[in-house]
């Protein structure tokens, strides 16, 4: 996938394959690899901006409760509308900056605004126990 990042769009299936490899790699580092659930469509033909989904998936592993991550990642595609929902367990502390969203999501929002103006929605929900990011993109050309 790295060699394709100069492209404006790559097949969604290749992006999903890249995410599958990333998730598998992260699972190798975990005490309980079964604490990760990842669902996705098979054999899609849509195109998507390269590596646009990766920051959300990375955040699941970066900010999860290391003792009990409970990571769930779901990608759904209906016609040209893609929905990614990623959630993970967190350990909430008084000085936690998890409500801020972070630089990664801020940069992702800017990139989405350039690539999918008026065709995307990125939301973050934080509770005492979990962090959930939802991304919706209309992939129509």
Task: List the predicted regions and their residue ranges.
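C-terminal end segment of the histidine kinase catalytic
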Residues: 140-141
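Two-component histidine phosphotransfer core
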Residues: 1-125, 130-134
């Amino acid at each position: 996938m790295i060699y394709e990042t100069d492209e404006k769009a790559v097949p969604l299936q290749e992006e999903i394959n890249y995410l599958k490899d990333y998730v598998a790699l992260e699972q190798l580092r975990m005490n309980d690899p079964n604490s990760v659930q990842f669902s996705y469509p098979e054999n899609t033909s849509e195109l998507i901006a390269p590596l646009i989904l990766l920051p959300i998936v990375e955040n699941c592993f970066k900010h999860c409760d290391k003792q009990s991550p409970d990571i769930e990642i779901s990608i759904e595609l209906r016609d040209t509308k893609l929905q990614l929902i990623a959630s993970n367990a967190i350990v909430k502390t008084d000085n936690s900056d998890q409500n801020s969203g972070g630089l990664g999501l801020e940069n992702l929002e800017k990139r989405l605004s350039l690539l999918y103006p008026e065709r995307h929605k990125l939301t973050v929900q934080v509770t005492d126990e979990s962090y959930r990011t939802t991304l919706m993109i209309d992939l129509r050309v």
